[in-house]
Amino acid sequence: MAKERVLDLRRPVTVWRSQDLQDGRSAESLTMILRTVGCRWNRCTMCGYAGEGAPASALDLIAQFECAMERSSTDVSVVKIYTSGSFLDPAEMPVQARDEILKRLKALGIKKLVIETRPEYVTPQTVEICQTCLPTEFAIGLETASDLIRENAIKKGFTFQDFVNASETVHRQGGRVKAYLLLKPPLLTEGQAMRDAIASARAARDHADILSLNLCNVQRNTMVERMWERGEFRPPWLWSALEVLKSVPGPIVCDPVGAGTRRGPHNCGECDDAVAEAIRTHALSQDVAPLQSLDCQCKSTWTELMELEEQSFGNIV
């Protein structure tokens, strides 16, 4: 009989140090994923994070934050706090924990905080609370500018106008907005997904300070995983990500999580590491020149596949 997994509610899911783009330059950042009760919406077709939820109290979350900050140093100027849901949702991040975390970050002199939230939790009050403590970047999972795709393929539960309204609320109080865009939602062909990502990036540009291109990967216990197991979904080609990055004016960043694996974005296996590394380098430099020179024999396969899909399914996006 399998042992039941015991979760330590006073330790974060994970924490790591990395480089982050800040004011056009590379900066040392600390990223933590806190274990909360999980996303209240919990219906997105590609998201498996809800399975990581647990009944963490405000004191548990403060302890998780303290544990994560042990990895920090004076070099860290950016702190990113992710909850697999919405930092601004009081049902997920109790006000007591939120306010204590903000107070401590302010005392440490952190230059920028990045949090994730759905647009319905972005209010003048919640933005002011964050901005009063330290400059905050509010990351919103827009995924696509198409309401049709967002509702039917992703089941996100809000509209493009909801995103615009939240963005305006943030900007009125001097905050920054990051828009997450999803490359290859389920039900779209490779070419459709690539064109939608480019169109979405251009539409979101007027409302976001920075764009983040997220390459769809296959997470467990999701609709996307069930489609993938039936052979109905393939994660995006890394070539498609390159085309989006080359086609959209910056700043736009991308971290190809799971690149080169069956469940993650991949090409043929031979060029995956080189292309993924070029994408990560571009996130810090915003220089598209290195992306132009990448090549592999599988690139023609990618092109032919998209042409075949267009002949089979047509151009609907």
PLM regions: where:
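Structural recognition of alpha->loop->beta junctions
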Residues: 133-136, 194-212, 273-294
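Distinct, well-ordered alpha-helical segments
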Residues: 91-99, 123-131, 191
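Conserved C-terminal portion of the radical SAM core fold
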Residues: 161-222, 240-256
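N-terminal pre-triad scaffold of radical SAM enzymes
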Residues: 6-54, 70-83, 136, 211
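Acidic (Asp/Glu)-rich catalytic clusters
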Residues: 69-74, 102-108, 128-135, 168-173, ...
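Core AdoMet radical
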Residues: 49-93, 105-122, 135-163, 210-212
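Active-site-proximal loop/turn and secondary-structure-junction residues that shape catalytic pockets
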Residues: 85-87, 119-121, 144-146, 183-187, ...
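Auxiliary Fe-S-binding modules of radical SAM enzymes
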Residues: 2-22, 216-317
